[in-house]
From Swiss-Prot:
Record GO cellular component, one term: cytoplasm
Annotated S-adenosyl-L-methionine binding sites: 98-99, 114-115, 150-151, 168
Pfam family, one: SAM_MT
A molecular function GO annotation: rRNA (guanine-N2-)-methyltransferase activity
UniProt keyword Nucleotide-binding, yes or no: no
E.C. number(s) listed in UniProt: 2.1.1.242
UniProt protein name: Ribosomal RNA small subunit methyltransferase J
Family statement: Belongs to the methyltransferase superfamily. RsmJ family.
Gene name, Swiss-Prot/TrEMBL: rsmJ
Function: Specifically methylates the guanosine in position 1516 of 16S rRNA.
């Protein structure tokens, strides 16, 4: 079980801890709080850091949904979004769900897979609020769902027809920007790097009927040492695309 600190007098937090099999530990490095109708994760020895929340309604993700370039974005091109083609996507390494949300906002049905129970709890809480939102709730309910568990398990268990598997394994970041530093510091100390990421490509290729997309920092080697069919480069990252069949 994952150890976490939380206020045991708060029924909502007790329910969440039981649901995700989180074990209370007064010495734990991380704390879960439930305030203003949202679940947040805090690093206890860095109280000045804001809590990490999954928020699909406001902030950076909402701004990107409204002004982020639509289907012209690199991620949209990578998964094969085009006129008349809106693929079903499994995001095998969901994290805070930002890339999954971008794809869902562009029309894709997205199944998010997340193996760390604390991160999955944050995702579930973000989905709960998004499903209830007047502006995005209807299409979020239709398009975005969560499959808790490891990618290796999920890729074997998911029975839906899946066009694309999207992978963004946690990789040691060099970026020194404040946001990346904050979130990656907290995240990497919580979940660690995805040391088994190389093992994801083969099951992903088995599940995807059309393609597998792997997001990598520009300095990272190819996943599992396998050269992609094509690469879409951005300023700091790249999307390695492994094509099985044409998008149609």
């Amino acid at each position: 079980m994952t150890r976490i600190f939380f206020n045991q007098q708060y029924p909502t937090l007790v329910d969440i801890s039981q649901r995700w099999q989180l074990e209370f530990d007064k010495e734990a490095e991380f704390e879960l709080k439930f305030e203003q109708n949202q679940l947040s994760l805090h690093k206890r020895d860095e109280p000045k850091l804001d809590g990490i929340v999954v928020d699909f309604i406001s902030g950076a993700v909402a701004h990107r949904r409204k002004f982020g370039g639509g289907r012209g974005q690199s991620i949209a091109k990578a998964v094969g979004l085009k006129q008349g083609v809106t693929p079903t996507v499994v995001d095998g390494t969901a994290g805070l769900g930002r890339d999954a949300f971008v794809l869902a906002s562009l029309g894709c049905k997205v199944i998010m897979v997340e193996r760390h129970p604390v991160v999955a709890a944050l995702l579930e809480d973000g989905l709960r609020r998004a499903y209830d939102d007047a502006e995005i709730g209807a299409w979020m309910t239709e398009r975005m769902s969560l499959f808790p568990g490891s990618s290796l398990e999920a890729l074997a268990k998911i029975t839906d027809a899946v066009d694309v598997v999207y992978l963004d394994p946690m990789y040691p970041h060099r970026d020194k920007s404040a946001l990346v530093k904050k979130e990656m510091r907290v995240f990497q100390s919580l979940v660690g790097a995805d040391l088994d990421a190389d093992g994801l490509l083969t099951p992903a290729m088995t599940l995807a009927t059309k393609r597998v997309v792997v997001k990598r920092p520009d300095y990272a080697e190819d996943l599992d040492g396998i050269k992609p069919s094509m690469v879409i480069a951005t300023k700091k990252n790249r999307f390695d695309v492994y094509i099985k069949a044409a998008m149609k």
